[in-house]
Amino acid sequence: MAHPFRPTFLHSAMMLAAASVLLAGAGGAHLFHRLAPAPQAPHAPKLLLAPMIGVIEPCVLSTADLPASMDDLGPLCRGPQGSAAALVESTLKALQPAARPDAGVELGYTLPVPLLRLFRQGEDGGWRIDDDMVGRLVRTLMDAPRPAILYLFSTHFSSQAPIEETLAADPSNMGQTRDGPLGMDDYYDSKVFNWTFATTRNTLTERRVQAVQAVLDAACRMAPQDRAKIRGVTLLGELHHLFPNFQAGMGFDGPYRVTDYSADSVAGFRRYLRQAFGRIEQLNRVVGADYASFDEVVPPSRDIRFEPLRRYTEHIDAFAQGTLPVSGWAHVEGATARHPAWVHVYRNGDFVGRTAVRWGRQDVLAAKPEFGDANTGWRIDLDFKRLPAGLHRLDVFLEASPGALTHLGTRDIAIMDRQQSTPRLLPQHPLPAATPPGAAVQAHIDSPQPNASYYYNPLVPLWHAFRAQQVVDYLRFFDAQVARSCLRDVPRYTHQIIPFTNPSWDANKFAIQASLRPLDGIRLGVSLYGEPTYGQSYFDWLARSGQSRYGITEFHPLKAMDTAAMQQVFERHARHGAEFLSFFVEPRWQGALVPRGHNMFSFDPDNAQFGSDRLYRSVQRALAPPAR
């Protein structure tokens, strides 16, 4: 049985099921030029709402059977001049029946282009671009009168492309841990291909480039007024390093296995160190090693607790880069986003820092729905690189009301030296006065675990920095493809996650940090779920990031919001530099839901998950003309 085309994306917060997604394209007809609202001037100074509509399956791929009641849609999608424009316009008309020029936002759409799905296998076994499919995609841009974000995507999530199995059979296309090439994995109901980006000299990259070039060539044959509808191009989708057990392996537990340890990556790491330090003696001074040359350096790959090391610099685990998370959750009756509870951390009786209780914890809400709020998470990263070896005592307090501390618990941890000497308890200082938790407080300390040990290896942060640079280099390689085309002047964006907004995730596994910093010629594109969509955490990070303009490539508050609150969210992001905002929407033909594998995160009047039905209505009312 053919499965519906449903690539998925990694969402912040620990979801209980996978997002069945994909998007854009179905049914276009030139008659919609006169039925739809007139296009706005290019690059209007409004926030562009660019929902990703699940129209790929029924129109662009033509793999889904349409019910008899939608017989009139088929020819628009699949005819000689078929496109997804008719279904795009029908869906957007349901969201905004009449244009509203005075609105603070403009309504367009995102057209995702599944790069590896653009290939078909010939009778000779060779793979060629499906020109008909490319034509339907590009005609969508031509036939739909609205502004669009062109999303050129190829991620580790399967797009159910036939060529994927062929590419995965070549080890040079797959990411490698220290144990060798990663195979395929699963993320809930989606297949994961652990592609590498440590090199561009493989067939995976060649095919991606071939597909991008085919789309760009076709787009560049459009009339200038049609090309002008393209407000932005997003590159590849979520690009980050990978690890085994992708569904459950995002945290700090278990053996530390990350990509990429291929020969190309190891050679690249040595070049990276040579460029950074110049002389091997300088590297040796920094990391405390005795390498004779850069060619002797190997990436850290062993755990000192369980494996013999030839050099100490071979050690790696989730904490060897020099920080450890102190994290957990807390629910305080009466706390609000404006007046949150605070967590204070003390080390050996000395104050370390405090953090607001505000991070999303969908797992806590699922276990305790009576809280009615997922934003119960907290985390402080403790830098232990310069701490003396020995036993340290961490005490965690909750400040539920100003000045009133409640003691949540104590954790003894061992900061170890290279010789693994037996740690001794360090001197302690008096703790502040505190009271035991009352009935109005529920809380838990997730990490660190009692009596945990920590080893700092100064080579590990260099390894992670190199891995992060690999992400940037691969993005730049594909950015250059677009920059050489007729779309060179169209803004280009990343499409990245921000793993640090989930307090239970190890951001260094993903090594995504460098791609979130300002990149010459590439604007920030981020996927926001939960509190970062409407709360303060994302804007705090944005203020430190150096970014001035950005796109929101995926958006879901993970809770219902009324119209006024939704408008405030749109306005706030626009004030902070957001240029477009995309959320998933299910396709509707003349008001009826089009059958497909529906996305649990779609804003849709029939989807009650995460308040998505109410979010749809709120956006609908925000886009409606004011009542008279």
Residue spans for each PLM region:
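Signal that preferentially marks extracellular ectodomain short beta-strand elements
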Residues: T376-A389, A400
